[in-house]
Amino acid sequence: MMLQPPKVLLLYAHPESQDSVANRVLLQPVQQLEHVTVHDLYAHYPDFFIDIHHEQQLLRDHQVIVFQHPLYTYSCPALLKEWLDRVLARGFANGVGGHALTGKHWRSVITTGEQEGTYRIGGYNRYPMEDILRPFELTAAMCHMHWINPMIIYWARRQKPETLASHAQAYVQWLQSPLTRGL
């Protein structure tokens, strides 16, 4: 008997999605996976008025939460930051009584506009990517979630189509068995 993969909520946040070839290439094959719910935050909330209860229910209904977004000013796009601050509320995801996400898994899937070598001590961006992404890892820990090492596509807009296709294939393979691959 084959086990069903865990339900995955893919929270996609890109304010200029139509211009992101890399993110389109990553998302296209993922949408065929039945156990993956792709939730485009900018499409759902163009006015930034987030339905907190709906979002919290989505989180309750899934075991793996993927945050796919570009790296903006060493963080995430504004709507995702708003989402994190509002949806992962004290009493729901953290603090007294806030255990709704305990034991779930968090993975960040990030595209960048810079080469990998620029993310190092003394490099253009001054710090390694693991330091830049530390606030997301800390947020996962605050919510009692398991942190899965991020998938990062460096210099995304300059990647060759075959390289992006390879990243998309690796992404789909991981999503088919997210708790046994890429930990």
Curated annotation (Swiss-Prot):
One of its GO terms (molecular function) is NADH:ubiquinone reductase (non-electrogenic) activity. It is a peripheral membrane protein. Its EC number is 1.6.5.2. SUPFAM superfamilies: Flavoproteins. Keywords: Cell inner membrane, Cell membrane, Membrane, NAD, Oxidoreductase. It is found in: Cell inner membrane. One of its GO terms (cellular component) is plasma membrane. GO terms for biological process: positive regulation of potassium ion transmembrane transport; potassium ion transport. It is an enzyme of class 1 (oxidoreductase). Pfam families: Flavodoxin_2 (PF02525). HAMAP family: K_H_efflux_KefG (MF_01415). Regulatory subunit of a potassium efflux system that confers protection against electrophiles. Required for full activity of KefB. NCBIfam families: PRK04930.1. Interacts with KefB. Belongs to the NAD(P)H dehydrogenase (quinone) family. KefG subfamily. This is Glutathione-regulated potassium-efflux system ancillary protein KefG. It comes from Yersinia pestis. The lineage of its organism: Bacteria, Pseudomonadati, Pseudomonadota, Gammaproteobacteria, Enterobacterales.
